[in-house]
């Protein structure tokens, strides 16, 4: 049994895998890290525990403390130059965010063609894999929630919008929501167009993925918890 933990900016996503399929997945807020103890109560000792952590040393330590008696050895993943069919062409490969690295590995395990890999969470990352598995690079932009909050907090007159997407928005809340979603979808489509590959696809994961996906005009599909898929793939290949 493999346990995969993706410690992100907002939540800790977890998954239990038996080598063939996911048995369970879930998420807890960092403030509720104690809830991870239910893994100890509900599951037998794992063969491997895989951890990807972008939330800092303290967050990683709290996770380890909760699971120490049950999983004394953690395999904490670091970005590498080459692994599982992905070549990391970042200027300094080790400085790529481990969440992005795991998402790329997860995407490559699901699709062997050129792929735009989108993680739509607190931040939105849009990364490109070519058909040979080379990570060409990517962009980081504020996620939907951050964009909405920045307009509410950074202006005197604009609210925290609770509007709906509209082709031609005719109220302020709709105008804000539409602008934010169009910014996200437009960035994805712009980067997708650079691939110039008729077989290319786009994978979207993260809390805002579905909200963006319905407005995309490029070939795409949703993929649950791509970083967990990457951790799973690493565990099975190592």
UniProtKB/Swiss-Prot annotation:
One of its GO terms (molecular function) is pantothenate kinase activity. GO terms for biological process: coenzyme A biosynthetic process. ATP binds at residues 6-13, 122. It is found in: Cytoplasm. Its cofactor is NH4(+); K(+). Keywords: ATP-binding, Coenzyme A biosynthesis, Cytoplasm, Kinase, Nucleotide-binding, Potassium, Transferase. Pathway: Cofactor biosynthesis; coenzyme A biosynthesis; CoA from (R)-pantothenate: step 1/5. Signal peptide: none annotated. It catalyses: (R)-pantothenate + ATP = (R)-4'-phosphopantothenate + ADP + H(+). This is Type III pantothenate kinase. It comes from Dechloromonas aromatica (strain RCB).
């Amino acid at each position: 049994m493999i346990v995969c933990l993706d410690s992100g900016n907002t939540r800790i996503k977890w998954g239990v895998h038996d080598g063939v399929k996911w048995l369970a997945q879930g998420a807890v807020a960092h403030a509720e890290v104690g809830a991870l103890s239910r893994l100890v109560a509900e599951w037998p000792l794992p063969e491997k525990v895989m951890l990807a952590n972008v939330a800092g040393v303290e967050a990683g330590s709290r996770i380890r403390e909760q699971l120490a008696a049950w999983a004394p050895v953690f395999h904490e993943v670091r970005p590498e130059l080459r692994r599982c069919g992905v070549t990391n062409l970042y200027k300094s490969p080790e400085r790529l965010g481990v969440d992005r690295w795991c998402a790329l590995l997860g995407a490559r395990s699901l699709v062997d063609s050129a792929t735009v890999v989108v993680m739509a969470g607190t931040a939105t990352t849009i990364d490109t894999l070519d058909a040979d598995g080379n990570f060409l690079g990517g962009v980081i932009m504020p996620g939907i929630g951050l964009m909405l909050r920045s307009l509410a907090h950074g202006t005197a007159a604009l609210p925290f919008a609770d509007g709906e997407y509209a082709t031609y928005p005719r109220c302020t809340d709709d105008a804000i929501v539409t602008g934010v979603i169009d910014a996200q979808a437009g960035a994805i489509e712009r980067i997708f167009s650079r691939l110039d590959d008729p077989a290319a696809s786009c994978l979207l994961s993260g809390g805002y993925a579905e909200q963006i996906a319905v407005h995309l005009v490029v070939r795409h599909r949703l993929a649950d918890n791509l970083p967990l898929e990457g951790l799973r793939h690493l565990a099975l290949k190592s």
